[in-house]
């Protein structure tokens, strides 16, 4: 089982070999999880249950302007990359076009293969993420090629109320994956 060291963005040299018995489940997580080419033809389709997990917001700024799912995803990524990968806003913004191409190629074509959908968006998360990302986006210099992108996100965040409720977010919340303080990763 490969392991990625996200602090340097490379595969770690050590891994584990797993052996499963017939009654043991396998959970495949990640952008390729729904890709049918991932499993060998010997795998019995009747034993497979696929779940598509994504941030699929249904929130609106008003009666005419919805918050796009991509807005939630880029906020999550900006905060997570800064908090856990020591990545600047410019670095993450610079990778966003590649991330979107990867979604179009490796995720969206296979989402219909899912047997179930799990929406991970929380109603209050944009208000929480704003606290982390807003001041960092304000520091992107005007001469940066990502300045316009940063300003667009700041403009969007200006419509969002702040929420200082971190103490009330449980350590098992999906939001903790992005802001830190979760039960699962140290």
Model-identified regions with their sequence ranges:
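Conserved NTP phosphate-binding and transfer environment spanning the P-loop NTPase/kinase superfamily
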Residues: 36-186
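Structural recognition of the conserved hydrophobic beta-strand(s) that form the central parallel beta-sheet
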Residues: 25-29, 52
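ATP-dependent small-molecule kinase phosphotransfer cores
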Residues: 1-26, 87-99
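Short beta->alpha connector loops
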Residues: 31-34
């Amino acid at each position: 089982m490969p392991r990625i060291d996200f602090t340097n963005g490379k595969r770690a040299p050590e891994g584990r070999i797993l052996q499963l018995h017939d009654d043991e489940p396998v959970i495949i997580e990640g952008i390729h999880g729904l890709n049918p080419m991932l499993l060998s033809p010997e795998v019995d389709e009747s034993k497979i249950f696929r779940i598509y997990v994504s941030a699929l917001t249904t929130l609106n700024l008003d009666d005419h302007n919805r918050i796009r799912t991509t807005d939630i995803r880029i906020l999550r990524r900006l905060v997570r990359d800064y908090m856990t990968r020591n990545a600047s806003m410019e670095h993450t913004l610079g990778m966003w076009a590649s991330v979107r191409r990867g979604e179009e190629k490796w995720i969206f074509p296979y989402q219909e293969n899912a047997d179930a959908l799990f929406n991970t968006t929380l109603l209050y998360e944009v208000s929480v993420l704003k606290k982390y990302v807003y001041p960092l986006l304000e520091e992107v210099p005007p001469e940066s090629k990502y300045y316009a992108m940063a300003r667009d996100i700041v403009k969007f965040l200006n419509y969002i109320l702040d929420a200082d409720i971190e103490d009330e977010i449980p350590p098992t919340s999906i939001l903790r994956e992005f802001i830190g303080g979760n039960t699962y990763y140290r």
